Amino acid sequence: MAGLSGRRWTGLRAALVLVVALVLQVSVLADLRVAGAIGDLLLVVVVAAGITGGADRGAAWGFAAGLLYDLVLDTPFGLTALTYTLIGVAVGAAGTAIGRTGGWWPVVLAAAAGLAQATLYTVIGNVVGVAYPAGDVPGIGLVLAAWSAVLVLPMLRVLWWVHGHSEPDRLEVLLR
């Protein structure tokens, strides 16, 4: 019974983090434009989930965060969920492949995820019939990369809390 209780708290914490991130995204970050682009806090949550839990956890968090964000965006429903899921899998797989090297690799992965998000969103959006100008991708990608790189280390601590310190050794190595 204790295991179910722990899972329930983990689920509630995860939902709380996603809802708070969404509220901050649409209320605070939406007004902090840099070169016409805004940071993506939900993307940072997905990146941190992939780093702390691997590809499976990154995919699950990516899908959930993407669907939640799709509810408030004026884009084809599922577009953000698809891109976040792909990024969660990629970051989780890269984090597993890199292993416990420590250092700045979470920041590098987060920056790469920001660039990938801008590219994937544009490519998949154009495939489903939403015309996104490809010329805007580098600028948007750089803004997303910068925001993601800055916010990923604090978000790793949040994800550690969500999962009840389930992987403290890995996180302690990451955050040294």
What do the PLM-derived regions correspond to, one by one?
Residues M1-R176:
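Terminal, non-globular segments
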